[in-house]
Amino acid sequence: MERPVPGQGYGFPRSHRLASPVEFRFVFEDACRSSDSWLTVLARPNSLAHPRLGLALSRKQIRKAVDRNRIKRLVRESFRLRQAQLGTIDYVVMARTPATSVNSAVLLRALEKHWLILTRRCSGSSSP
């Protein structure tokens, strides 16, 4: 992963997060989807000037808090470093149970793949 250059906007402010149920519902209603054994990522173009991230990790799927927190940290860090390339799209990341048994490098590679796929799919979603 590339190292951030100071002053280039690699922060993760509240404005870049999905927080309310209405914002999550907006993405769930008509989303582009990318899935693998560990993660499901939903995406939908927004009308803002930046991408936003929402995390939906259920205790039913990921039982231990330490595992949920590790996955959330990895997703936020991957998003933070890639946000300049992610377009004006809202993303919601959901984890599956097998995500707890895979190492962090594998999850980061999977996220990179999902970001790339969904950025292509959603930016071209206005045409059939």
From Swiss-Prot:
Q: What enzyme category does the UniProt record give?
A: hydrolase
GO cellular component terms, alphabetically, are:
ribonuclease P complex
Q: What GO MF annotations does this protein's record show? A: 3'-tRNA processing endoribonuclease activity; ribonuclease P activity; tRNA binding
| Reactions accelerated catalytically | Endonucleolytic cleavage of RNA, removing 5'-extranucleotides from tRNA precursor
Tagged with keyword RNA-binding: yes
Cysteines joined through disulfide linkages: none
Keywords, A to Z? Answer: Endonuclease, Hydrolase, Nuclease, RNA-binding, tRNA processing
Entries under InterPro entries matching the protein: Ribosomal_Su5_D2-typ_SF, Ribsml_uS5_D2-typ_fold_subgr, RNase_P, RNase_P_CS
GO BP, one annotated term? tRNA 5'-leader removal
Q: Which Pfam families match?
A: Ribonuclease_P
PROSITE patterns in the record: RIBONUCLEASE_P (PS00648)
Which EC number(s) are documented for this chain? 3.1.26.5
Q: What does this protein do?
A: RNaseP catalyzes the removal of the 5'-leader sequence from pre-tRNA to produce the mature 5'-terminus. It can also cleave other RNA substrates such as 4.5S RNA. The protein component plays an auxiliary but essential role in vivo by binding to the 5'-leader sequence and broadening the substrate specificity of the ribozyme.
Oligomer status and interactors:
Consists of a catalytic RNA component (M1 or rnpB) and a protein subunit.
- What HAMAP family does its record include? RNase_P
| Family from the record | Belongs to the RnpA family.
Identification of the protein by name: Ribonuclease P protein component
What species does this protein belong to?
Answer: Methylococcus capsulatus (strain ATCC 33009 / NCIMB 11132 / Bath)
Gene that codes for this? rnpA
